[in-house]
């Protein structure tokens, strides 16, 4: 008899556990199965979003892979929230909390059912960090599988995507397109299954997962509706058995060096600002000492190479065609930007995996060369100053303005700010501020894609700065600063900003400040009262437990310092 690979399901051995086994027999387990490791297949399948509509089929393929490796697969589901569908509505308040709900629910099932390993399948934005947090907390050998990117839509021979529709709303308001043109974009932007197609949050976090080594090589850029994606999930199911045999756990993979690799890849690809929030949260679960300042440290050294949307020309499917994320990682590793000695779910190191990976195709245009990058350093920067002492996040790729000073136009809700833009009350040079939308204040730190896209659609993407203690979608571009912390709800300086105060954003100095004296800030602070927190349900629990964005907006910080 071979080595017993069961880590936790040994708990079902013996006469005292006959009742437990009786219930497992009812779902199909046999005497032989009780000798094998039990592997959970966590799926975020749902019909509420195109990102996840195909995941049930992928879960069944993962189940097949687990069974093929002579282990016992047990499929279970968790929730998903569509950022794109909830955007601009009250539903967006539930988006970030869903990350932690996903993580908690997967960890709960793995723990409660005494599972020995895990294949976690996610697609939409919060699925991916939710799955990674669960993997880190559950602690059993695990592989993450990305559901894959959507294909681009097409109108009149031009590729479009979901952000084209958001920006179309602004173009429509400005009179640049009519009702029929907007409808044409709406009806053709999303042609099938898969996550939003640019280097937005889902594709960013999938790429980060591959760079971390917690997903299989090549899997982050394989499209949702492809044979390669089907192969990814079946191979992931088979890989778990190998991890069990070699005794490789998430803690062996999710190291400080691995997170530095992930940040490097995100910077090179021009990823979403949400990557900072999510990688901080995943590192917290993995008990890795990663801080918001690590992002600036790496940002200064890593060039932005990918000409991907939202600031570039191409989408993830185009990157797949020229070699995918593995080819980009190979290029980065060959030029000394990655730690090659990090362990991965293949049982090999990053360097060993990349030695077998193909290089980028010749004459491709998606990834720019080191001697002519899109930007000489990374596009995600952390700003600090008297408006955000513990850090704010900006994405500066494609933004020509390096310094902007203007009068604050202050709003306490996204709805009010949006209406002001549509009513042409926001002028060039203004600094549009949306506050009380942070993790606690929102609650849920909603994304401001609708607002930023309307500004871009109206031609004001670089003439009006947008600041918030909320978040931005990975599809956002323009002169935007989010994650301002401490947030207004916590009494951060943004709460004391008043209409007309002059605000300066300086990306070169990495500073964000208001031209208000310390004495005046203290005077305003003395008159300020915190609004009441949300009281009930999911959002109430979230508001009372979540930390600030500069710590990843996690809900289990507890007594850790």
Swiss-Prot record:
**Top EC category:** lyase
Pathway as given in its UniProt record: Amino-acid biosynthesis; L-isoleucine biosynthesis; L-isoleucine from 2-oxobutanoate: step 3/4; Amino-acid biosynthesis; L-valine biosynthesis; L-valine from pyruvate: step 3/4
Q: Which SUPFAM superfamilies match?
A: IlvD/EDD N-terminal domain-like, LeuD/IlvD-like
| GO BP annotation list | isoleucine biosynthetic process; L-valine biosynthetic process
* Record bears the keyword RNA-binding: no
Q: What is its EC number?
A: 4.2.1.9
Binding residues for Mg(2+): 83, 125-126, 447
- Write down the superkingdom of origin: Bacteria
Q: Know the name of this protein?
A: Dihydroxy-acid dehydratase
